[in-house]
A protein has these predicted regions:
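Long helical/loop segments within the catalytic core of UDP-sugar-dependent glycosyltransferases
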Residues: 1-5, 18-101, 112, 134-166
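Generic structural signal for helix capping and beta-alpha/helix-loop junctions
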Residues: 45, 128-129
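Catalytic donor-sugar/metal-binding loop of nucleotide-sugar-dependent glycosyltransferases
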Residues: 99, 108-127
Length: 168
């Protein structure tokens, strides 16, 4: 069990830059910041047509969607890797719950409902591999889609009823 105040999370296939943690930690001087998310980059983005298409899709999510949500104060989700969490934010939000496939999205939304702020770092990237084979890609997308639907059924009623700004 990790014991630190801040928890860095990286999947095994991610290759963060050696100085990335120093850059992310600075945001936690604000005691309300619960999570800092880096942008994903793609080690094998040019491998084949499938990886090129995924690069476009993922860049749309990370460059456009996550940036916009963060800059407008809207909810955005921690993408399961390439970031740092404040331990207290995880604990106060109910911890990692395993009733959805996308535990990252679930925890992200619960933490933001509790008032924790999230920071998205467009200029800090963590390169990783993306699926090069269609069946692996389809399985990944099915998991993500099912997980987000599970989170929706679990949390969207609370989100809609929460006294949050319209922009969320």
């Amino acid at each position: 069990t990790a014991k630190g105040e801040l928890l860095a999370i990286f999947d095994a296939d991610f290759v963060p830059k050696p100085d990335c943690l120093r850059k992310l930690v600075d945001f936690f001087t604000d005691p309300l910041v619960g999570c800092a998310q880096m942008r994903w980059a793609h080690i094998n983005g040019g491998y084949n047509l499938l990886t090129r298409l995924q690069t476009i899709m993922l860049d749309g999510h990370f460059v456009v969607e996550q940036t916009t949500r963060n800059r407008t104060g809207g909810f955005f989700n921690f993408n399961g890797t390439a970031g740092i969490w404040r331990r207290r934010a995880i604990e106060m939000s109910g911890g990692w719950q395993h009733d959805t496939l996308t535990v990252d999205t679930d925890l992200s939304f619960r933490a933001q409902l509790m008032g924790w702020k999230f920071v998205y770092l467009l200029d800090e990237e963590a390169p990783a591999e993306i699926p090069v084979e269609i069946n692996a890609f389809k399985a990944q997308q099915r998991r993500w889609a099912k997980g987000v639907m599970q989170v929706g059924l679990k949390l969207y009623p609370r989100i809609w009823l929460a006294p949050l700004p319209y922009r969320v």
